[in-house]
Amino acid sequence: MEITKIGNGNEVTLKLKGCLDTTATPDFAAAIEGTAGAATLVLDMSELEFISSSALRQLVATKKKRGAEFKIALLGMNEVVREVFDVTGLDEIFEVR
C-alpha cells in the first residue's frame, strides 16, 4: 500500500495505491491525521485495488470527528471499490467525483 499526500491548505488529496487492507489501515489513519486543518479530504482511488471494512470505519470516524463542515471526496473508484461504497451506503455520506 502506498499513500501519497498532495497539497496543503483547504483541500488535501491522498493518492491511494494497492490494497487498503487491515494491516494498512494504521498507515491510512496516520495519513488522514496528517491532513488536519483541511476543509476537504480528497481520496484519489484510481489505483486502489481493495478497501477493507476497517478502512471504511476509519473514514466514518474521521468524518464524525471533524464535523459536518468537513468533506470527504472519493475520486476515480474502480468497479470493485465503488461496489463496496454502494452496498454499504457510504456513497451517500461522502462526495463521489
Predicted segment positions?
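Short acidic-hydrophobic, aromatic-tinged amphipathic segments that line or gate anion-handling sites
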Residues: E95-R97
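STAS-typified acidic loop motif
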Residues: E2-F28, F50
